[in-house]
Amino acid sequence: MPFFSICIPQHNRTSFLIEACRQLKLQTCQDFEICISDDCSTDGRGEELQQFLRESQIAFVYRRQERNRRYDGNLRAAIGLASGEYCILMGNDDCLADDTTLESLLGILINHPQTGVAITNFKDFASGEITRRMVRTGNLGSGPQVAVRSFRNVSFVSGVIFRRDRAQAHATDRWDGSEMYQMYVASRIVAEGYDLLELDMVAVRKDMTIPGEAVDSYGNRPRLNPCPIVERKTTLLQLGALVSDAVRPFAGKQLVWYEVQILLQVLFFTYPFCILNARRVQSWKFAAGNCLGMRPKNLFSQMDLPLLHRWLLGSIFFAVTCAALVMPLSLFDAWQPKLFAISKSILQRT
């Protein structure tokens, strides 16, 4: 049984995945397997990928899905193929940061045997800009409070590490369509009592570049024109209920308080960023439609919150919405690094 299973949900982008696998072959630690779930790729290169892996003598498991399962189901399927002690989740256009990444992670995880989830940092492949979602190295502990405090740190999937047996034990299709399956699993593992290990190390280079190849991105999508202001329910709407569901069996009488903390983080940090980003890549009207989709009657629909809590959170929603719709984008761009640092410092103190 290998120590690591590199779990990759695959759909097209085969050139990027082959390059990522080529770099895996260079790792000083070879105690790993690659687990690829192909979500009905249409580029016809599945056999080419497998042939490359065979010729490279890399241990791998490859399975093509019979139907398109989209992101959540495909990630769950990739984890389901794993047999290692730990699963390292990777996007199919991301790669490990350097040749000693697995060796470093192996030593750390052996010294922390109660780890259920580990989170690492990442940097941009082209620019080298580092995103420090973890600002120190250490054991954050376990339990529902730790899960509630940390769930936003796994929104980017690459470089998130799960204890394999627990990730497979918590497999569910309840949140298919949320595009945050890793967030549910991470929160559930930590809430049930396994440690969350934060690692201030860059383990991943994201968004690989290959000459003559390109990948689709949200920022490159054409603008809607005309763009009416109509309610648009995004995956963000499910975030609070998803994390609540993950911690619920272990929350006891504190569930409402945990749900309030979850929604406060969504409303103060995740939601305004999404609205401002929608204004940047689409339009003000498009962003306003997203705001309508997040209105309190939708946001609270899967939570049994007391009336007072709904009123207070609804008031916060209204204030944040107004701020996100009127703030100059130039001001947000200038303040974004500082706001990111503030959000991290707040969570470190809680």
Regions found by a protein language model. Name each.
Residues Q65-A82:
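Glycine-rich, basic loop-to-helix element that forms the pyrophosphate-binding segment
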Residues T120, G138-C227:
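Conserved nucleotide-sugar donor-binding catalytic segment
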Residues T100-R133:
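Conserved donor NDP-sugar-binding/catalytic core segment of glycosyltransferases
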Residues F32-C40, R63-Q65, G91:
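Short beta-strand/loop segment that forms part of the nucleotide-sugar
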Residues C87:
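Short aromatic/hydrophobic "clamp" motif used to bind/position activated sugar donors
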Residues D38-E47, R67, C95:
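A conserved acidic beta->alpha catalytic loop
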Residues E179, Y184-S187, A191, M201-T350:
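C-terminal subregions of glycosyltransferases and related glycan-biosynthesis enzymes
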Residues N12-L26:
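Short, well-formed alpha-helical segments that are part of the catalytic scaffolds
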